[in-house]
Amino acid sequence: MIEDTMTLLSLLGRIMRYFLLRPETLFLLCISLALWSYFFHTDEVKTIVKSSRDAVKMVKGKVAEIMQNDRLGGLDVLEAEFSKTWEFKSHNVAVYSIQGRRDHMEDRFEVLMDLANKTHPSIFGIFDGHGGETAAEYVKSRLPEALKQHLQDYEKDKENSVLSYQTILEQQILSIDREMLEKLTVSYDEAGTTCLIALLSDKDLTVANVGDSRGVLCDKDGNAIPLSHDHKPYQLKERKRIKRAGGFISFNGSWRVQGILAMSRSLGDYPLKNLNVVIPDPDILTFDLDKLQPEFMILASDGLWDAFSNEEAVRFIKDRLDEPHFGAKSIVLQSFYRGCPDNITVMVVKFRNSSKTEEQ
């Protein structure tokens, strides 16, 4: 009886080894477990994936910091590696911009302030060009000045005006786009640009966005508050609009309108504008400064956001507000060493209620 039992167990063991330990069986088992985890434990899987990504970002960031500190003595001697750099510094605003690994510099920025007389709210702009620098340069050189003039007129008779910061922003952005399209169409220049504009007054912050440059604010509690939302072709609202216009989106490294443009709204881009698949309409948001009591805001081209999340960027800058560029230079270099291939432009604006900021 015992011998029969042992023989049976031995036979079962051989059968299990033959079937269960075969490579094909193990492969199918792994696939089944993966599918089961995906469909029945989606949240847990997402958490694990997100944690893994954050860990990789953290390691890459630490390596980047070591590289920054070891290369030729630190930050102040790295400019030669970036081909070209640009910077701006005021008492509460700092900008740092690099050409990076690109052959051409297509980013532009502008700062217009009148803190003494306050004839208009402060104007901050980021313009990330594509298909050449023509569009970004055109918008940078004309839109802020046009806004300044209209805002000065508005401030003189604000109480009786039917306008607002939002309507002025929308009117001037659309006007500049129409004006630029006429000129670029004649010269067959297909360049385009993003447009991120922030108007800062005593009580309000108004932000207009076209494209995928982005603004983020750090509130009194250290939270990252989005000031804008990227216009991307894969978003449901944008995808439906593009389809209604007779267009399509396809994946070529990223989702693109007509297989060409990686954003669904822009200024310029006359061939896609003629098809009505890309539009210049800005999204405009207004924020109550008394309620948020912000410490600083970040306005940046997508070169930064390809390397940093909103929350990570806020934490990074918050720890470096005492630096000469309020952390703008450090985060640009960090993005570069994380492998960003694009032009990178970062503007940091400190608010007057920040304990580290002078009277605005």
Curated annotation (Swiss-Prot):
Name the needed cofactors: Mg(2+); Mn(2+)
Do you know which SUPFAM superfamilies this protein is assigned to? PP2C-like (SSF81606)
Q: How does it sit in the membrane?
A: Single-pass type I membrane protein
The residue ranges of the PPM-type phosphatase domain are 92-351
UniProt keywords, alphabetically? Hydrolase, Magnesium, Manganese, Membrane, Metal-binding, Protein phosphatase, Transmembrane, Transmembrane helix
Relay the cofactor remark from the entry. Binds 2 magnesium or manganese ions per subunit.
State the source organism's domain of life.
Eukaryota
Which class of enzymes does this protein belong to?
hydrolase
Q: Which GO terms describe its molecular function?
A: metal ion binding; protein serine/threonine phosphatase activity
GO BP, one example?
A: signal transduction
Tell where it localizes.
Membrane
Q: Where, in residue ranges, is this chain on the Extracellular side? A: 1-25
Disulphide bridges: none
Q: Which residues cross the membrane?
A: 26-42
Note the SMART domains from the entry. Answer: PP2C_SIG (SM00331), PP2Cc (SM00332)
Q: Name one GO cellular component term.
A: membrane
Coiled-coil positions are none
Its annotated function is as follows: Acts as a suppressor of the SAPK signaling pathways by associating with and dephosphorylating MAP3K7/TAK1 and MAP3K5, and by attenuating the association between MAP3K7/TAK1 and MAP2K4 or MAP2K6.
- Subunit details for this protein? Interacts with MAP3K7/TAK1 and MAP3K5.
Q: Write the protein's name.
A: Protein phosphatase 1L
Organism per entry: Bos taurus
Q: Which gene encodes it?
A: PPM1L
